[in-house]
């Protein structure tokens, strides 16, 4: 036997016990806690298998049929499958599936369609936008003249009149529609009309709602935008990564050059394999049922929380996420996030529009139903989760240091619920 054989045969448990231990503990956490982080989901066994495949060994700089390395025949097959499937899902003419993340996808569009110093108009982080849409700490806020639009103080809805006024005042080269914490549908046609009125390109970042769009439960931005970006996880249930879509051949060429060699070197072929598998799953008939359940569960969770005395930003949701205003309960986001985690429920603290608290504290939390729906939760289960969340809220309100007895009791109920809907 070759002395290299153990390298190829020794399992992780023998090779690196500390890493194996951490992975097993994370598996146990995912199995035993309710995941309500709106940007997270649970992938299939098939996606895990593809992402853990030998494709991790392969360098494949370039694009299918035009690689800078030899031995890319089967890498080409996998990437072509991913491209064809995502084009079919969103009825797009061109797709790039190589971005390592949504941020890389957004960065590639800016590199392709704008120059440093150009004006970019995007949704402010405070109003529910994303860091990559022009926030000051991000590259997009440093390289570009980033102008930000927000929401109406009374309705908390996007103020399209403000978007239009800012566009005419600042004449942006690029307008970005998309969000990380906005619970309502977007009017892509209105965004495109505004962009056309000032000669700007329209980019839609559909990362959060890509699955909702794929299922036909939200307007398709590919029909309106010059270019569309997304992540592959969240509501699409794929591996962590990104992609870019367009129907414009010239823009597609610029995007390809911006992704490679502009921002990235070799693509992560094992992740692209996972993307291809996930896209194939989206094309199955039961994916629409899944998304319908995600939306119904979000409505059910929201109804319970509202009945329990908390406010929902905009009054409800059109998608998979809820932005919960904790001020009626006299609570803040950071301690609520911590208390819920102690009780077996994971979410994230989140600012609400016009929040006066620091981003590390916040007046709200963001909740989402995709992961719980993936493991099989229905309306009844999400109503139960909502009831348990309210119990933690009320206990924390009575005891700001945390109510250990209530949190542990809720944790036991959450554990029992999760045992009924196992993963992996």
Curated annotation (Swiss-Prot):
Q: Which residues bind (6S)-5,6,7,8-tetrahydrofolate?
A: 125, 129-131
Pathway terms, separated by semicolons = One-carbon metabolism; tetrahydrofolate interconversion; Amino-acid biosynthesis; glycine biosynthesis; glycine from L-serine: step 1/1
| Functional note | Catalyzes the reversible interconversion of serine and glycine with tetrahydrofolate (THF) serving as the one-carbon carrier. This reaction serves as the major source of one-carbon groups required for the biosynthesis of purines, thymidylate, methionine, and other important biomolecules. Also exhibits THF-independent aldolase activity toward beta-hydroxyamino acids, producing glycine and aldehydes, via a retro-aldol mechanism.
PANTHER family, per database record: SERINE HYDROXYMETHYLTRANSFERASE (PTHR11680), SERINE HYDROXYMETHYLTRANSFERASE 1 (PTHR11680:SF35)
Q: Which GO terms describe its biological process?
A: glycine biosynthetic process from serine; tetrahydrofolate interconversion
User: What cellular component GO annotations does this protein have?
Assistant: cytosol
Q: Which reaction does it catalyse?
A: (6R)-5,10-methylene-5,6,7,8-tetrahydrofolate + glycine + H2O = (6S)-5,6,7,8-tetrahydrofolate + L-serine
As cofactor, the record names: pyridoxal 5'-phosphate
Q: Which domain of life is it from?
A: Bacteria
Q: Which CDD domains match?
A: SHMT
Modified sites of kind N6-(pyridoxal phosphate)lysine: 234
* UniProt protein name: Serine hydroxymethyltransferase 1
Whose protein is this, by species?
Burkholderia lata (strain ATCC 17760 / DSM 23089 / LMG 22485 / NCIMB 9086 / R18194 / 383)
Q: Where is this site: Plays an important role in substrate specificity?
A: 233
The answer to keyword Transmembrane applying to this record is no
Task: Provide the assembly information.
Answer: Homodimer.
- Keywords, A to Z? Amino-acid biosynthesis, Cytoplasm, One-carbon metabolism, Pyridoxal phosphate, Transferase
| EC annotation from Swiss-Prot or TrEMBL | 2.1.2.1
